[in-house]
Amino acid sequence: GYGSTTVTRAMGDDEVEQWYAHWELAADEPNRIHWVLDLEGEAVGAAFLHAINAEDRRARYAIGLYDPSFFGRGLGQQATRLVLQHAFETLMLHRVDLRVLDFNHRAIATYRACGFVEEGRERETCFLDGRWYDDVVMAVLEHEFAVARGGRRET
């Protein structure tokens, strides 16, 4: 998860409910779209476009999976590509960016596979487990996403 350097256990039911409650409140905010990631009828995570700015045609992306047992299955990459497809083809955005803590190598690799490129770092933005971590700033532009997916339409 975002708030720990290692993910060693699944979120408990109470934690998942709190996480959903936080994002349900946020879902009422304008300029935000969220999706529940469903695997065979089970909610396994969520993805968000927020800070959507129609004038500048940009938004910020976030995604989370609740349980490490879902890691490594390609769910994050599939969800990210579908959200980006919606962002660029339906919302007609030009740019989608995100921030990810520098120790989250799996997420960074997923974002790169979806066309995101590193634009910079915000140094020592998060203090966890007695140590400072950087936020890596990444973004993908509409033409970069088209190249990254090889002209294939995600289904």
Regions inferred by a protein language model and the residue ranges of each:
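GNAT-family acyltransferases
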Residues: 1-69, 140-155
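Glycine-rich acetyl-CoA-binding "A-motif" of GNAT/NAT acetyltransferases
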Residues: 42-45, 106, 132
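Short, conserved glycine- and acidic-residue-centered signature motifs
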Residues: 54, 76, 80, 131
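Conserved acetyl-CoA-binding loop-helix of GNAT-fold acetyltransferases
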Residues: 66, 72-86, 105-113
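A structural signal for the main folded, soluble domain(s) of proteins
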Residues: 89, 118, 142-145
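Conserved GNAT acetyl-CoA-binding A-motif
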Residues: 89-99
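Conserved catalytic-core motifs of GNAT/GCN5-like acyltransferases
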Residues: 97-100, 117-133, 137
